[in-house]
Amino acid sequence: MPLRRTALSGSGTAGPSALSATSDGSTSATAAATDKVALRALVVAVDDSDYGLPTWKSTLDRVGAAYDVLLTRSTPLTADTLVRADGVGRYDAILLTSNGLLYAENGGYVSGLDADEWNVLWAYERDYAVRQAVLYGSHGTWPEDYCLQAASEGAIGATPLKTALTAAGARVFDYLKPSAQVPVVESYVYRTAVRPDCSATPLLTAGNDTVGVLSPSADGRERMMLTFTSNQYLLQSDLLVYGLFRWASRGLFLGEQRHYLHVDVDDWFNSADHYYPDGHIESDPGYQMSAHDAYNVSLRQQALRQKYPLAGSLTLGMAYNGGDANLRAGVRCSPYGGVGQLTATTRCLANTFRWINHTLTHPEMNFTDYATSRSEIADNLAVAQRLGLPVDGSVLKTGEYSGLGVYNPDPNNDTDPPTDFGLTASNPEFLRAAHDLGVKYLHGNMSFPSHRPVCFNCGVTHPLDTSLTVVPDWPTNIAYHCTTPAEETAFYNSFYGPNGKFPYWPTNLTYNQVISAETDVAMSHLSSGSLYTHTFHIANLRDYGSGRTLLTDWLDSVLGKYSSYYAVPVLNLDWPALAKRSVSRNGHFAQLAAGVDGVFDRAAGTVTVSSPQAGTVTVSGARTADATTYGSEVSAPVTLSAGQPVAITASPLP
């Protein structure tokens, strides 16, 4: 394959070249190279249409990593692209979208880098000991040899190709279960074998074929490559691409990766509409939760913790409406009690769940006045105090996320989707009441564009009151008024079956298929690292038989999927901690925008972080007094004053 000089798009200002030609014509950085590299990745792609570019960017954005993108078809790659004027390497990880950076031109394929540019890149990797990870590549020796020979190749559709980690792969991807079967779908796959004359090590296999490899180069560079395509929407990407980046950076980067599962249940003490399999809805009396249902959920929660040790801290959040509570009830669990024993059983279970202020009577807060808004918030807190329910008053979830600029202009229309008028259309009297009562965090809804943060796992600072942060929830299709598998299945198919309101599936689904489809969506949230909670309702807690409920069926399914892939725990925070985490992410991304800089000094074993702007940034691979561990990884918040460097102990991964 001929090399051709093309270009690169990308990265930063240049200082004097730190790479130079040696007497034999090769490229070297040895004379100017230092033991220092920035905590920043370089994504090398062909152009904006490069299929691998969104996958790398999505992974890095989720982490909150610092990175640059070089588009090789339009901007030259020079030594100054890679090395600062003071000799510090600009990047601690080189991330290629493909091993050849090829694109079609004049009936053939050419590379975005010419021979000189490839040599400059390789010299930088060698002299600064920077690793290279390739999202997709194949066998062959051009532009360099990964020690792979062809076995077969072909497209994979929706039927998964099961791939397995080797012992070496399990060490690299140690956040995955060693026995995990990574499903490869919607992909083009090169099945390869490691040549017997090479020292390459298979990391991922499909049967006897290698589809992921660790391959040292002849000059000592470290390279890793997958031999199948992926995109940012596929589970295989969530499972593997972060691991490529983590390996390339040695676990030293700005940001962090964690996995969370949070579940809230709305309307405790309240009643719900009740949907029946024939499609009719009963509202009076509707569904009312019993003491047995409440006690049963406590047992199911404990059973799930025991069945799935990775979710050992799982605790449901109950968003309660205290207006229907019996304030004269005692404290007694009634495992087989009815509706009348719910409050006493709730008091008995006060420390079994987490409790969230959901307003006293669940009114829509879109146009309520100050006095009404204040009493709904404050009186519900008073009920919790009287019943002994621990509630943090800084968190508020309104009925149907009302008061935050999303509502139907016709107040009598409860069936059509609401209109998102934006957060500036929020009820100012409600906001004022919330502020005055010490509320800091308001639940939002990811279904509403105005509630979606601009950065991953962030919150939305309210434009009408910057002391308030909107932290969105994930909705689910486990319907708020369904209590049994038959009801949920009928409702789901009435929406998404071939004859539904929003046809999606070619045939109606069974209940097990509904749960599987819904937990595939939830699994994508978990595997991506999403912080946000999933929302359910009290009807989903009904014991429909043998202690089973719609919610715990959903939890059993999603935790089963997670546990089949991952070795690291799924984190479960209380709501104040969750909300504070989202606010800290806002601060982290503000630091990235301000130009925060981290530099790893290999000789000193330190990372030095500085920023032109005061604030806090999260650093992975850093050990401080506030550091936390997650699997084999460690990360820490680093608080910065403007222009004042902070040196911390580095803890790189192998």
Where are these regions (language model features)?
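Secretory targeting and sorting signals
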Residues: M1-A18
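Metal-dependent polysaccharide deacetylase catalytic core of the NodB/CE4 family, i.e.
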Residues: L39-L42, N99, N119-V120, E125-Y128, ...
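Helical hinge/lid and interdomain linker segments adjacent to catalytic or ligand-binding clefts
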Residues: L42-V134, G140-W142
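An acidic, glycine-rich "communication" segment
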Residues: V130-G207
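Non-catalytic propeptide/linker segments at domain boundaries
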Residues: Y190-F269, H274-G312, A319-Y320, R332-P335
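Catalytic grooves of carbohydrate-active enzymes
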Residues: T229-N231, F245-H274, P475-N572
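Carbohydrate-binding surface patches
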Residues: G595-T629
